[in-house]
């Protein structure tokens, strides 16, 4: 066993659109983490720095204790608090793995798989652009693609019929183009009411989507259960949830077929391992939410590698800058699968020079409908 050590300092980096952290130990071990939700990295950075005062001088191995102390001291919760706690949790697990010279998944029960099936984001403002991107990704080896079936100006449709017809046409075109060898995942992004999403879901049944994601706002598990009951397609939801308690309500309501915890928001590796176990008891599989940097991807793969009820991994592509610049050696992607790394901790190393890249902050851009009202994105 390595000699005991203490946390020396915590560093934060606003890198492009993401928040990365490093936790330094007195013995020289450095843990890497990522936290926050897209668009709110600055306040999450401030929260990490606030929590760092407590962490300095503490034993990094007491991961659950530090989470509980900080969580209970916060009084008021939410995405900023949980984003900071998630970043810290991931970095502390990275430290533990590095100090013990084993991958994180070895510390969480051991490996359940050697590679992780990914679904790739595809898009296009026109139907032809969407189809072309889906075909391109299928040719690259991906066996699942995910897309929004609406144009970017979806909120300017004059009628529900026009909106739904366009969605059905786009989903059908993608399915026909990629064939039975590629699963399609339909993302609604909470842009519909329960009634609208039920009617659209029924029309999409013919295309056998792998999942129907966030067909309405996730705030009401009871209403989400209505959508699940009245559509003969699997619902996937949960990316906005920050605690195990929200997932418990969702699962108790039988409101989803897949859960989508975000490791950088829902308590890090510790929190999402708990969520996965809760879902396992309901025979529900896990599709981790992953719209952030390669650090988030690496954390997701560690979780995917040690749970029995993994289904798919969200993947947005990391072969082009700035993402391709962040790691010394990127995770191996082959035929739409990420290889589970064997290195200690997260199994990655940051390219220190890349951390100099400036922040690219999100601009608030809520869409406005024809009547002047704000729309969900």
Residue ranges of model-derived segments:
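Structured beta-strand/loop patches that form or line metal/cofactor-binding pockets in enzymes
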Residues: 1-32, 36, 318-324, 373, ...
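Conserved, mostly hydrophobic/aromatic
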Residues: 7, 28, 51, 88, ...
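Short glycine-enriched loops at secondary-structure junctions
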Residues: 16, 190-192, 217, 240-243
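Metal- or metallocofactor-binding catalytic centers and their adjacent structured scaffolds
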Residues: 24-100
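Shared catalytic-loop signature of beta/alpha-barrel
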Residues: 49-53, 62-65, 202, 208-211, ...
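Glycine-rich, aromatic-flanked loop segments that form ligand/cofactor-binding clefts
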Residues: 89-125, 129
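Metal-dependent enolase-superfamily TIM-barrel catalytic cores that perform enediolate-based chemistry
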Residues: 115-231
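Extended hydrophobic packing segments that form well-structured cores
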Residues: 346-377
């Amino acid at each position: 066993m390595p000699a005991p050590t203490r946390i020396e300092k915590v560093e934060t980096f606003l890198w492009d659109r993401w928040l990365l952290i490093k936790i330094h130990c007195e013995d020289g071990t450095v843990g890497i983490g990522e936290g926050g939700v897209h668009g709110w990295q600055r306040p999450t950075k401030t929260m990490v720095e606030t929590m760092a005062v407590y962490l300095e001088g503490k034993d990094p191995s007491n991961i659950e204790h530090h989470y509980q102390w900080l969580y209970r001291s916060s009084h008021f919760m939410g995405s900023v608090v949980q984003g900071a706690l998630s970043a810290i949790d991931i970095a502390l697990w990275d430290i533990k793995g590095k100090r013990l010279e084993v991958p994180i998944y070895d510390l969480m029960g051991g490996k359940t798989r050697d590679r992780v099936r990914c679904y790739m984001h595809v898009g296009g403002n026109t139907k032809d652009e969407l189809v072309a991107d889906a075909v391109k990704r299928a040719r690259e080896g991906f066996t699942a693609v995910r897309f929004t079936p609406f144009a970017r100006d979806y909120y300017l449709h004059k009628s529900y019929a026009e909106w739904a017809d366009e969605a059905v046409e786009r989903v059908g075109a993608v399915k026909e183009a990629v064939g039975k060898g590629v699963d399609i995942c339909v993302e609604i992004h909470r842009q519909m009411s329960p009634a609208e999403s039920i009617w659209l879901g029924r029309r999409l049944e013919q295309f056998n989507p792998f999942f129907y994601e966030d067909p309405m706002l996730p705030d009401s598990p009871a209403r989400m259960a209505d959508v699940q009951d009245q559509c003969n397609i699997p619902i996937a939801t949960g990316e906005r949830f920050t605690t195990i308690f929200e997932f418990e309500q969702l699962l108790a309501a039988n409101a989803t077929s897949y859960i989508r915890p975000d490791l950088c928001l829902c308590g890090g590796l510790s929190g999402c391992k708990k969520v996965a176990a809760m879902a396992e008891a309901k025979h529900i599989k896990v599709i981790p939410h992953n719209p952030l940097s390669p650090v988030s991807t690496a954390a997701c793969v560690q979780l995917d590698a040690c749970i029995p009820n993994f289904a798919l991994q969200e993947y947005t592509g990391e072969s082009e800058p700035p993402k391709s610049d962040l790691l010394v050696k990127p995770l191996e992607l082959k035929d739409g699968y990420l290889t589970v790394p064997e290195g200690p901790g997260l199994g990655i190393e940051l390219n220190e020079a890349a951390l100099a890249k400036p922040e690219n902050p999100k601009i608030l851009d809520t869409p406005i409908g024809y009547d002047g009202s704000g729309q969900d994105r």
